Amino acid sequence: MKVLGIETSCDDCCVAVVENGIHILSNIKLNQPEHKKYYGIVPEIASRLHTEAIMSVCIKALKKANTKISEIDLIAVTSRPGLIGSLIVGLNFAKGLAISLKKPIICIDHILGHLYAPLMHSKIEYPFISLLLSGGHTLIAKQKNFDDVEILGRTLDDACGEAFDKVAKHYDMGFPGGPNIEQISKNGDENTFQFPVTTFKKKENWYDFSYSGLKTACIHQLEKFKSKDNPTTKNNIAASFQKAAFENLITPLKRAIKDTQINKLVIAGGVASNLYLREKIDKLKIQTYYPPLDLCTDNGAMIAGLGFNMYLKYGESPIEIDANSRIENYKNQYRGKNNEKNFSNA
């Protein structure tokens, strides 16, 4: 079965063709550099650019896959969560294709797509612990299947990638913040500033994260945390912030691994491409899986891959389904698309 995957939840316009849930025939992504001068995503600009680009991106994906549009068996599309304008562009485009081609459509949760991405590269047996790190989401989950996901911990404020973006904006390091801070930090001393690392002692927040304190310390209280006579340079700020940002993840992650007694870890999301983070994770000395770099960031392949499996198990989505910018009725457990404990109706 050939699945056309469409992902437009934020600023990347992505279309892919995937066969049988795992064989990637094409995976096309168009970035939107227009946002760089604003140091962040402007929703109105993002949705307009998606409207202008999605047809050509789809044609490129089909051409690279050597596939005619009539040969597509299923259309998978991200319907939540994300920027509502961007989601609507992708969803309406997918609906138009489904209606005109008389093909089924399956709507996919963006978060579950990221959690599925590593399985397209490596054969990983369930259960395992997943760590999702992106500009919009930071969470730890226990996965028993592609549709059986228990959220153990999540950020209580900023996402990890969001904190990188805000620090980078303040110090004029460029957008997006993650890759720029990683590059700038290579020539810095990570011990110049001893920024605070947040860990929670309450049971209900045992696996949760917080980045607001670190962000505030780095932006507004810089000299308070200076511990060496090194100069206050962008390189040293970037290196010290990056160190603290990833140390922030380690304690909740260790707790989750110990308490669940699951020694397999899967890393997903755009921040997973950071090589410094990978060095930190490798020191945990557990079996760890990373998706290739093109599957770390937003992409259509993960939507098509998960869409294949969801369709086989649950069937198609109603054509009337709407885009949703948020995760409704957030619960800690996700089991299938019809379970009352869903954190997604996708």
UniProtKB/Swiss-Prot annotation:
Cofactor annotation comment: Binds 1 Fe(2+) ion per subunit.
GO cellular component entries: cytoplasm
Reaction catalysis annotation: L-threonylcarbamoyladenylate + adenosine(37) in tRNA = N(6)-L-threonylcarbamoyladenosine(37) in tRNA + AMP + H(+)
Signal sequence interval, chain numbering: none
Biological process, per Gene Ontology: tRNA threonylcarbamoyladenosine modification
Localization of this protein: Cytoplasm
GO MF terms, alphabetically ordered: iron ion binding; N(6)-L-threonylcarbamoyladenine synthase activity
E.C. designation(s): 2.3.1.234
4Fe-4S found in the keyword field: no
Cofactors that this protein relies on: Fe(2+)
Keyword tRNA processing set for record: yes
Chain residues that bind Fe cation: 110, 114, 298
Short name of one Pfam family: TsaD
Matches recorded under InterPro entries: ATPase_NBD, Gcp-like_dom, KAE1/TsaD, Peptidase_M22_CS, TsaD
Keywords from the named record: Acyltransferase, Cytoplasm, Iron, Metal-binding, Transferase, tRNA processing
Function summary: Required for the formation of a threonylcarbamoyl group on adenosine at position 37 (t(6)A37) in tRNAs that read codons beginning with adenine. Is involved in the transfer of the threonylcarbamoyl moiety of threonylcarbamoyl-AMP (TC-AMP) to the N6 group of A37, together with TsaE and TsaB. TsaD likely plays a direct catalytic role in this reaction.
HAMAP family: TsaD
Protein family per UniProt: Belongs to the KAE1 / TsaD family.
Name the UniProt record assigns to this protein: tRNA N6-adenosine threonylcarbamoyltransferase
UniProt organism field: Borreliella burgdorferi (strain ZS7) (Borrelia burgdorferi)
